[in-house]
Amino acid sequence: MLFACSSSRVQTGNTNDTQYSEINSDSLYALRVSFFSIGSGIDRKTRQDYDRFIKEFEQKNNVSILLDKATWGKEGEIDYCIKLNNLSTELQEQFIRSTKDKIKDSKLVRLYENTTCKYKI
């Protein structure tokens, strides 16, 4: 196991071929909200509700959510890659809790925390 201060190492490839790629802490996102499809498109209602939630959160708290959108797939699949380091700890926790609450009923949305933006170009 390898450790580094500003980046982490991730093993790629098979176990016989040891190759490592660097993940810089700047490329990590607090959240990745992934709207995916299993043959009939994404959950558009949940996406619209989540877009509305982000705008309302920004207005209510006078902040900007740092959001990168990465599209992938052929049925509208999209990842919302969100950095929250410009928010106070309290607002970060509130945003994460609210995000979990907004997407909890959808079977076509996944949430990842402290991760990279998989499809970002």
Which residue ranges define each predicted feature?
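C-terminal motif of bacterial Sec signal peptides marking the signal peptidase cleavage site
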Residues: L2-S6
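Short edge beta-strands and adjacent turn/loop segments
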Residues: Y20-Y29, S64-E75
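Short beta-strand elements
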Residues: K60-A70, R110-T115
